[in-house]
């Protein structure tokens, strides 16, 4: 018996509305900087209730073993062998978001993307509220950089960049007048990204958009024109101080002040990797480890670097950060999970997950976001979608169906 012919499936798709609403709210919370582990639990429990009520556990033996890899990575994070249970909250969020992604496919099928629209909607609404004077400037800006309600401009830069990539990747879903409305929203999100003055997000978005546009566009002049337009807009809308930062990073990246401050941070993280190479230290331990390291080596560090930051919460590099957090064992498990998901995304023609990986691979050269809800949701929810299709296909005894063909791509 194929699972979609089973009785529980017929009731399932008549009862998904509450899960859909909770998923919309989750992305709204993400866009307004108010997402917490407790709020992540809401769609998890609602979706879990629907699946349990439908007796989906009867088919658990059909689930591909590969889909269990991210769960193993989440449990490893929760357990944190190098520093017992230090990252239990991060691990819980990874597990929850991944399972929510799977549930989105099983419960909503190809309608899950509508809930993701609430991320760019939330960003747009809060920015418009700032522009019309509902929110004061000190509330949503920091050092002439836009923050909105996301606590730091670097967080806003990453979130707005992924929101923009989502709108572009799924643009074939928008029909009629909604296509024009969402195109306007995309322009607004681009402006928000520019005003965040997050140079790492700029670079990662440029690389990701280049991949997207060259993949989708037959006219190679298009990406050149778009790049020129964005550069011109950036020059006119960025405050002079932030524009100088961007120009400095282009003209002399190795002498840039921010790059200089990253060096002692990376040095401390590498020392942490050497102290616990196999099982890691946990990301929660980094602040204390970094502080102790710079205190113990203050004279040497001050002689070699122009500036040494006293308080740092993460390693500012995802590759170094993973080894510090997980060690060799956990990093291998993490990369295995992501790599296999990427392979399956290529087979499914899921362009969004591919772009997310490209973005975080570049963004991660200078930032580490897996210690925050935004980084966890924007990586592990799309991963859950990829494995969710594998699970759905396994339950149907059919090859994976592509539910989110990117704009301009043709179904085979």
Region roles according to the model:
Residues 38-49, 89-102, 128, 154-170, ...:
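Hydrophobic core segments of transmembrane alpha-helices in multi-pass, intramembrane catalytic enzymes
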